[in-house]
Amino acid sequence: MSFYFKNIKPDLHSGNEDEEDDIASIIRINDTSDAEGSQSEDELKTLSFGSLKKADEMMDNEEQTSRKSKSKANGEKKHLNKPKSRELTEKQRKLDDGQRRQSGLQEEEAQQKSQSIKMFAEESFGEESDSDSDGGFFDEESNDEANQNGKKKKGKRKHAPTESSSKKKVRSMRKIPGLEDNKSKSIYQDVRFDKAMGKSEDLAKIRQRYKFLDEYREKEINELDSMLHDRKFLSKISDREKSEMEQQVRRMKSRLETVQVMEMEQKIVKDYEAEINKNNKNKYHLKDSEKRKVIQKWKFEHMKGKQREKVMDRKRKKRLGKEFKQFEFHKR
């Protein structure tokens, strides 16, 4: 026996046998692969070019159909996803708006709280605190402001009261409409035109009460006239001042004359009505036109000779002018 068989032991496999088995399996695999390759080559040799071309066309058609089906499926998915995406974006926007509003309200509440704290701090720790009476004057306003800040802030209404800033200092005295005293206006008022003393329409009574003022006016007019006739005084003043004084004298004289004439006319009408209504139970009052005629008659009777002649000349000229206008050569 050879050396190889002598060294074999029962129930034990040597390492050389394992190696040989592996080599044999590898050789078998290679043989099978070679056989398959030879068979495929033989089959390709038997195929014609026309059949190969048809097979290529079939493969291309299948690929195109598969691509189209995939593109359609993707398009439908996109169309389905678009409205969902829009809905999601709208929801996100709404949520963002709600969060912003909540944050804005929280900030406003925080600002109001800080302002109220500052107000209380300024009132309690100010350098110059107002007196107790002044503080009581504003108790109601401070309570109202605290209640308003405690509630949730709503939108400003049309007829809401005006809001003043907390940075401005509060005045010790509040301005009340109707009780404002304007310093520009004079405090002293004329009693004649005060409603508390009676109706201002009753001019006759006012004239009777203050008739003594005419004497003072006459004295002032006489003094100004004497000053204007004084040469020494005129040499000291300018021409402008002289003209102003002359205008003032004329103005005062015209006012005094108008007041005196009105008083005289009222007296004439009153006396005439008293004579008419002596024996009448029902009093008769004259019209304005009748009053004018009565006044003119009285004035004409109490005029001097020269004044009457002047009045008659004026009336004669008026009458002639009216008659002259009525001629035919004026009616063209």
Curated annotation (Swiss-Prot):
From the UniProt record, give one GO term of the biological process aspect: maturation of SSU-rRNA from tricistronic rRNA transcript (SSU-rRNA, 5.8S rRNA, LSU-rRNA)
- Disulphide bridges: none
Compositionally biased intervals (Acidic residues) = 124-144
Query: Where are the compositionally biased (Basic and acidic residues) regions?
Result: 73-100, 321-332
Q: Which residues form a coiled coil?
A: 236-283
Q: Does the entry feature the keyword Transcription, yes or no?
A: no
Which residues belong to the signal peptide in this entry?
Answer: none
One Gene Ontology cellular component term attached to this UniProt record is: 90S preribosome
Q: Where is the region Disordered?
A: 1-184, 305-332
Where in or outside the cell it occurs: the entry states: Nucleus, Nucleolus
Q: From start to end residue, where is composition biased (Basic residues)?
A: 150-159
Pfam families the record matches: RRP36
Oligomeric and partner information:
Associates with 90S and pre-40S pre-ribosomal particles.
Function summary: Component of the 90S pre-ribosome involved in the maturation of rRNAs. Required for early cleavages of the pre-RNAs in the 40S ribosomal subunit maturation pathway.
The entry's family comment says: Belongs to the RRP36 family.
Kindly provide the name given to this protein in its UniProt entry: rRNA biogenesis protein RRP36
- Give the source species: Kluyveromyces lactis (strain ATCC 8585 / CBS 2359 / DSM 70799 / NBRC 1267 / NRRL Y-1140 / WM37)
Q: What is the lineage of its organism?
A: Eukaryota, Fungi, Dikarya, Ascomycota, Saccharomycotina
